[in-house]
Amino acid sequence: MTRFFLVRHGETEWNRLRKIQGVSDIPLNDTGRAQAAALGDILSKHSFDLIVSSPLSRAQETARIVAAKLGMPAPLAIHDLIERNYGEAEGSSGAELDTRYPAGVEIPGREDRADVAKRVVRTLHDLAIRHPDADIVVVAHGAVIRSVVEYAAPGEYSEPITNCSVHSFSHVAGELALVAFDDPMEVLSHELADEEFVDQNPAEARESSRG
């Protein structure tokens, strides 16, 4: 059995401002770095075999901070762990999204959710084949993790995926199963933020509300 611990990156300024990031390469802010360090302290109580991440800088920096806390080598960047592409909606706030693309209007260039799930699940499957019986930390993004949760446990979890939260999965005989949404080992990262946590991505929140 291979176990995966999917981690969302730490906070960025666009997260704080509730702007849609997608594949826009927005770095961590100071809160995000503190979240990553706190998560690293918690994960250091456990043993892991490998850390991989999305190629975007917010995920890579989170993964590097965690790897340093664990005394592990620099994480491997895997392109197919990149965040969902939100096309022309990237950089928009919720109000701007509603004005430019009201509910029901297609957002030009937005990646289909099913395509996100396909590439991410394929990546996890490939990692499980190459690293059987390993415990692997995967630092990625909210929509990436959401796609895997929906693949493994469709319709069961609608709660926001917080910065530096951990969601654990098992991979046995080619089957991916959700072990824990918000794994108990995680840091409650919203306690490090200045305001009550709500879903930071208005496009994802709107789509999730429709099922």
Sequence positions of predicted segments:
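Loop-to-helix element that buttresses phosphate recognition and phosphoryl-transfer chemistry
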Residues: 5-61, 109-121
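Glycine-rich phosphate-binding loop signature in dinucleotide/nucleotide-binding domains
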Residues: 45-47, 127-134
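Generic beta-sheet signal
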Residues: 4, 134-140
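Short glycine/proline- and acidic residue-enriched helix-loop micro-motifs
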Residues: 97-115, 200-210
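Phosphate-coordination/substrate-recognition cap region in phosphate-metabolizing enzymes
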Residues: 37-100
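Short active-site segment of divalent metal-dependent hydrolases/proteases
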Residues: 12, 144-145
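Acidic, low-complexity terminal tails and accessory targeting/binding regions
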Residues: 72, 84-95, 150-211
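Active-site signature of alpha/beta-hydrolase-fold catalytic machinery across serine-
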Residues: 65, 147, 151
